[in-house]
Amino acid sequence: MASKMSLRYSLFLIFFSLISLQGFAKKTGDVSELQIGVKFKPKTCEVQAHKGDTIKVHYRGKLTDGTVFDSSFERGDPFEFKLGSGQVIKGWDQGLLGACVGEKRKLKIPAKLGYGEQGSPPTIPGGATLIFDTELIAVNEKPAGGEEYGGDEDDEGYGNDEL
């Protein structure tokens, strides 16, 4: 009798622990797939980013707890790289494809498309989901030239309540 109760109690604890862990992962903001949210888009898209293009991007990188680990906005110096060439983390190569010059995106990047299980010590822990607020400044040296539409900067723009 005591062993049956002990077994039931153990099963209850295991079940409760699994439920708690699932809730904790969701609360921390971790994601398993790349999530792209368009925060702002120009009225017309004159220049769009494609694989092989050299792009300039302003960004702010954060952990899911809100800790900022890097920001070109604060430095006043956008980052330049060749899109799709592996010069940056995979989440950037995938998350900025198709963006228009002047477009602002929020990228939620899972560890597998970021710095993986090893992280990038000391600022980025292993297994970290990364959040980047990005603004595409130029594609192949072509800056924005079109009119911007009056989007709401505070609007998440995801179309997905999970973000």
UniProtKB/Swiss-Prot annotation:
Enzyme Commission code(s) on record: 5.2.1.8
Chain segments carrying region Disordered: 142-163
Keyword Endoplasmic reticulum: yes
Annotated keywords: Endoplasmic reticulum, Isomerase, Rotamase, Signal
Intervals of motif Prevents secretion from ER: 160-163
Presence of the UniProt keyword GTP-binding in the record: no
Protein location: Endoplasmic reticulum lumen
Pfam families (alphabetical): FKBP_C
Catalytic function, reaction form: [protein]-peptidylproline (omega=180) = [protein]-peptidylproline (omega=0)
Signal peptide bounds: 1-25
InterPro entries membership: FKBP2/11 (IPR044609), PPIase_dom_sf (IPR046357), PPIase_FKBP_dom (IPR001179)
Gene Ontology terms: biological process: chaperone-mediated protein folding; response to endoplasmic reticulum stress; response to fungus
GO cellular component, one term: Golgi apparatus
Start and end residues of each PPIase FKBP-type domain: 52-140
Top enzyme class: isomerase
Biased composition annotated in UniProt, kind: Acidic residues: 149-163
Location (main, coarse): endoplasmic reticulum
PROSITE patterns found in the cross-reference section: FKBP_PPIASE
Lineage top rank: taxon: Eukaryota
One Gene Ontology molecular-function label: peptidyl-prolyl cis-trans isomerase activity
Family as reported in the entry's similarity comment: Belongs to the FKBP-type PPIase family.
Function statement: PPIases accelerate the folding of proteins. It catalyzes the cis-trans isomerization of proline imidic peptide bonds in oligopeptides.
Protein name, as recorded: Peptidyl-prolyl cis-trans isomerase FKBP15-2
Organism whose genome encodes this protein: Arabidopsis thaliana
Gene field: FKBP15-2
